Amino acid sequence: MWQKPWGYKEGFAVCGGLFLVGTLWQVTLGKCTLSLFAWPVNIYAGVVYVLLLLALYLFFRKYYFVRWMSSYQTAVSAMISLVVMTVIMGLTRQYRPEVAVTGVEGWLGFSQMLSACSFVLLFFWFVTLLGIVILRRIHHFTVRDIPFLLSHLGLFFIAVRLNSTTIKIVCSTA
C-alpha cells in the first residue's frame, strides 16, 4: 500500500481515515453544527473554497497526491464511501438537530446525518475531488469535454449548495 501508482486501496484508506477522524471528532467535540455557514456566510465561504481549490490546482498540480485526487480510483472510493454512509444513516432513525442523542448513535452521529462529522468530512472530500477533476479538465480543455464539464459542474454546484443550513427538515407522521 502507498506504492505508486495509488489505487482503490489508498482511496478507501483515505476515506476510512476521514471516517475515523470524523468519529473521533464527534465523540470528543460533539456533532458538527454548520449553522455558521447560513446565508450570507455560505456565499463567502463558497467563494473562498473555490479560490482555495483553484490555488491548490494551479500551484500543486504536478504533485502526485493532487494528480491522484483527480483519478477515477479516488472518485469511486469516495462515492462508495458516501453511499455506504448514506445507506447506514438511511436505515437508522433520524432525529431533529435540537434533540440530544446519547449512546452509540450519538457517538457515531448516524441518527443525525446532517450533523455527523464523519459524513461532513467525507462529503467535503468528495466535493474537493470533484472540484479538482473539473479544474483538470478545464486546464486541458477540448470541445469533446463540454458534456463532461457541464455534468460535473452541475453536480458540483448542487453538492456545494446542499448543506445542512439549506435543507429543510420535514417530519411525517403516519
Report residues per predicted region.
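Solvent-exposed, non-transmembrane regions of integral membrane proteins
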Residues: 1-174
